[in-house]
């Protein structure tokens, strides 16, 4: 797609409001006030505070997810199906976090990195988001099959999980293609550029399509899969009094719960905004202002998710802590007496290695 040219752009097709009031945009702008000529009272968010948050999230994610990958790869001889999924999840979170410094820099001076980097960073962030939620759905199906429908052929999944992960990454690459094609630097006022979908005169229609795509395949469908699988998994665990396996599932449940707490608010607000843009909900200036503020706040909450999984593993995952301490003891960073005092975590006994996780 060529360079964005203001003289060929009908600004009334993109916005119907006063552009000078638009002082803040997210890294992936989704809230441009294009529905009614409203004057926001306070849409501006302290951009430097957002920069600090993004930098901290990036650092925590780099350290935490790198340690997760190290522990899993160090114990790859005993790596379970779930561990492979969690390894890919850590990779996705790591790459997601690597894009945050660029979005943080764009908070202060707008997008100054050109069209190519706009496409690349937007695409990487979109692919990693899709892959994260799809991998979580795969984990839920794996636990459902392992516990609710345990069979003698379950061990074969160890050889299939790599292909499942590759398929999820390829699906994420395909689902994110519209972002790669349409993202370009777009002017929102005389001096500020944002990295956003350049869809010309078809703004409203294509924007709704670009909203429905990630909301449906990147959140709603995986969410329904997770609710179904974990609902039946929990019922089976409680009915069979499988307390040991239930304790082993705590990390997985915590990972899914944190994902929902981080991304559900944003997706609910985004869904409400989509209904408003399609005129299914009456739009007023007050509602537009509330939606814009909510989208800004909940998007930041969603970005925090990329650094939280390693924290969950550290506090809940006994095997992760032991695995990390074992690596540190190998290189003399902690004493072997301290490692012995911590004790080796008991593994869940099973006819299949699929029901045990390193974390």
Swiss-Prot record:
Keyword Cell division: no
Record's subcellular location: Cell membrane
Gene3D superfamilies reported for this sequence: Rhodopsin 7-helix transmembrane proteins
Record PTM text: Phosphorylated upon ligand binding; which is required for desensitization.
Transmembrane portions of the chain: 48-74, 84-104, 120-141, 163-182, 208-230, 251-272, 294-314
PROSITE patterns documented for this protein: G_PROTEIN_RECEP_F1_1, G_PROTEIN_RECEP_F1_2
Record membrane topology: Multi-pass membrane protein
Molecular function via GO: chemokine receptor activity; interleukin-8 binding; interleukin-8 receptor activity
Keyword Cell membrane among UniProt keywords: yes
Keywords linked to the UniProt accession: Cell membrane, Chemotaxis, Disulfide bond, G-protein coupled receptor, Glycoprotein, Membrane, Phosphoprotein, Receptor, Transducer, Transmembrane, Transmembrane helix
Extracellular topological segments: 1-47, 105-119, 183-207, 273-293
Cited function: Receptor for interleukin-8 which is a powerful neutrophil chemotactic factor. Binding of IL-8 to the receptor causes activation of neutrophils. This response is mediated via a G-protein that activates a phosphatidylinositol-calcium second messenger system. Binds to IL-8 with high affinity. Also binds with high affinity to CXCL3, GRO/MGSA and NAP-2.
Name of the protein in its database record: C-X-C chemokine receptor type 2
Gene expressing this chain: Cxcr2
